[in-house]
Amino acid sequence: MIRSMARSFASAMGCDFAEMDVTLPEKRESAPLFGVDDVVFFGVPTYIGRVPNLIRPFFVSIKGGGALGIPVVTYGNRAYDDALVELRDIMEENGFKTVAAAAFPAEHSFSTTLAGGRPNEKDLQLAKDFARKIAEIITNNPHSICGDHTPVAVPGNPAPYSYYKAVISDNKSIDIRKVKPMTDPEKCTKCGLCALLCPMGSINISDPSITNGICIKCGACIKKCPRGAKSITDPDYLEHKRLLEEEYGNVIKKAELFYTT
């Protein structure tokens, strides 16, 4: 998604582009520095209505240096709540000038039903069109964009931002922060793929049944395991997932795009 935006923007502007995937821990060991000649598409997933809090300190360490910025969030077909306004504020507070923003539905980390298959071809085309429009705005209005600056207006509550509260039947709140995937020993071949994919570096590569650190429920180990050896069996988690799928599984959400001018 972000790659498509950056490539389309660069093509429209006739400039180079580079990408930085900070999903894995080793990619977050040092933060990039940007400057006034840069335009940065900054994408993050929505976690319980917010920017992922465990990776937030890294995002805050990225300095814009006057670069133009485009905050983009994905969300799993429920809502992005305060994630987009929070990301915009992080960028503004760290030297970016936000000129556009977007929120796109994407397959939920818990499920293949919630926004399954998203982003799809239509989403990717919209992302490209979004980037080209930003290029057009910058080209046609360089002084208004680069001069006096007003942050792009987006939905959401101002800081302090709100977390979404997971619930089950009878609207009972649950806490699934300590829930971790289980490993089926009859299916697991100890290939180590799950450990290599874990964004927190929490899975023991020698024994993938051991999760030493925090699990953020990104679903990578579950969805990418070639043997289907990983799953979450916690009853509250499964009930919450079922309710989400019941309420939002057949809903088709549209991307939302925002511009300063």
Segments (PLM) and residue ranges:
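FMN-binding flavodoxin-like domain, especially the glycine-rich phosphate-binding loop
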Residues: 1-26, 30-173, 233-261
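Generic detector of bulky aromatic hydrophobic side chains
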Residues: 45, 178-179, 208, 216, ...
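Proline-rich low-complexity regions
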Residues: 45, 52, 119, 181, ...
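A mid-sequence, solvent-exposed acidic-amphipathic segment
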Residues: 156-191, 195-196
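Iron-sulfur cluster-binding cysteine motifs and their immediate structural context
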Residues: 183-184, 189-216, 220-238
